[in-house]
């Protein structure tokens, strides 16, 4: 199934709890491979594995903020890295989308970054 989101319509799918398994960038297309895309049809929740594609994406304008813990209370610190650096350094990690936001020409995913043997931390991806 191919779905093209036109950003002016209601959001038909949810990525909440989706886990990004792989990120690829080729020919100005950024592709996030996720384990599940959720859809509500007639009150029923359905899920499908799939890909989220951003065509004509300038990867130099994409960033990831990685924090030292899951955010919610207290002090925290973190770092900002380019999406390309994230793709290079976090190949064995998994990013679970908790909140998705669509703002004009920007998409924001906030969630948990999971690495083997470590506690999850909050990360924010700007596309």
Placement of each model-derived feature along the sequence:
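Surface-exposed, interaction-prone regions used to assemble/regulate multi-protein complexes
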Residues: 1-127
């Amino acid at each position: 199934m191919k779905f093209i989101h036109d950003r002016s319509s209601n959001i038909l799918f949810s990525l909440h709890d989706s886990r990004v398994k792989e990120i690829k960038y080729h020919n100005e297309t950024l592709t996030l491979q996720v384990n599940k895309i959720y859809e509500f049809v007639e009150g029923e929740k359905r899920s499908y594995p799939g890909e989220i594609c951003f065509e004509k994406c300038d990867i130099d304008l994409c960033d990831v903020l990685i924090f030292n813990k899951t955010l919610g209370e207290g002090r925290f610190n973190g770092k900002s890295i380019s999406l390309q650096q994230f793709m290079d350094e976090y190949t064995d990690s998994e990013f679970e989308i908790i909140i998705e936001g669509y703002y004009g020409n920007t998409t924001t995913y906030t969630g948990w970054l999971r690495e083997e043997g470590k506690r999850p931390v909050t990360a924010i991806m700007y596309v």
